[in-house]
């Protein structure tokens, strides 16, 4: 017979069909277990009674069985789709906000119980937050910054043995990260200053993670870190330096997880695209590489610079901003592998950052801070001598901060190099730092930047990071510049300094 050699699965079904038939009648198939549906009404949402029920524990013995012997039901939301989960979480968030507003009214003894007004208020606040996060509207923080008191100032919260070259903050402003020239990578708490050190794994582990070791190899030199970036979700930390690799670390465990090879020279700058796991890396080999940290994969490569790339920045869009020693700023359209070129009058652009998708800020090696717009290939506004280094015994008479004065010595010292510029994301508040003894705050206006205050800080300011709230500023400072030893300030302290900002 045709089916004699086939293995029978389960018993045969004899109800209503032919006796001994192996084919199952769909009518008698076991009905699949249906997922419990959650009702989403405008006003009422079914919620669990306790934390235990919410986590799926409703009583039973230690083996997970119910006391009455019944099998525990599956999690209520185990089979929900991604869309259903987003809807459920959104409804829960709205309910929490409505409840918070009701409590505020009760505390204020307000008898008005209009839920429609609450919903309208919540709608406006959520819309404004979304527009601020996406960069469509600008938060006006600069006008709220008050003049620092005499007691205010930078205080060192994390110490390093050598110059700090890069700092970064987590998206919630609670944790900070710093890297120095001696290869030390630190993870620290902003409020308490408690530090944790990232430990470099052995060569065998690095090799298994994708690193290509070169011989002979000086460990102290090869681990010199020059760049650092943290993902917006706080999961990954990326570092790079003279070993030509991009190293990925797990922030939760502080363990090394991946080493990306590919650059042919020192990795000089790193940044994550906000809200994603895409990482952009710039190098002295004049290329920008794009990586997917989650998938541990290389995506693409962008060219355009004719000199070493010194700084990079990115926002939400697939766009990258880079500057280099070829006196150009490049706006990379990553998916298309195209670029827009902006030329600067300075001999070298040292730093850059996005203000918005259409505006950028740059710092150069002659103490100039410039504002750029997407539609003009030259700076929209140039503030000269923003960090001019004035030698001892020389007065400032005749030196115009934003004038046409040219210093007697055209070869500006390393103290005036604007090594760092930063903005409070989505706002009109910016800062710049050099080695001339202070960090400068700026207000970004329409086609102009206006100086606010000078915050004294001794040393080369190699990196800056604003808190998202705008309530404090972090600076990576050291006795030497970011790249090389073009200057030395023995009175400076190597470390991370924090300065509180008082907002009106």
UniProtKB/Swiss-Prot annotation:
SMART domains: WD40
WD repeats: 159-198, 220-259, 262-301, 304-342, 344-382, 413-452, 456-496
GO BP terms in the entry: acceptance of pollen; embryo development ending in seed dormancy; embryo sac development; rRNA processing
Positions of transmembrane segments: none
Tissue: Expressed in tissues with active in cell division such as shoot apexes, root tips, lateral root primordia, embryos, endosperm, pollen grains and embryo sacs.
Pfam family, any one: WD40
Region called Disordered, residue ranges: 1-120
Bias (Acidic residues) ranges: 41-54, 70-81, 107-120
Gene3D superfamilies from the UniProt entry: YVTN repeat-like/Quinoprotein amine dehydrogenase (2.130.10.10)
Keywords: Nucleus, Repeat, Ribonucleoprotein, RNA-binding, rRNA processing, WD repeat
Biased composition annotated in UniProt, kind: Basic and acidic residues: 20-33, 89-106
SUPFAM superfamilies linked: WD40 repeat-like
Effect of a null allele: Embryonic lethality when homozygous.
Annotated Gene Ontology cellular component terms: Cul4-RING E3 ubiquitin ligase complex; nucleolus; ribonucleoprotein complex
Places the protein is found: Nucleus, Nucleolus
GO molecular function, one term: U3 snoRNA binding
InterPro entries per UniProt: G-protein_beta_WD-40_rep, Rrp9-like, WD40/YVTN_repeat-like_dom_sf, WD40_repeat_CS, WD40_repeat_dom_sf, WD40_rpt
Function: Component of a nucleolar small nuclear ribonucleoprotein particle (snoRNP) thought to participate in the processing and modification of pre-ribosomal RNA. Essential for embryogenesis. Plays a critical role in embryo sac development and gametic cell fate. Required for the correct positioning of the first division plane of zygote. May function during early embryogenesis.
Family from the record: Belongs to the WD repeat RRP9 family.
This protein's name: U3 snoRNP-associated protein-like YAO
Organism: Arabidopsis thaliana (Mouse-ear cress)
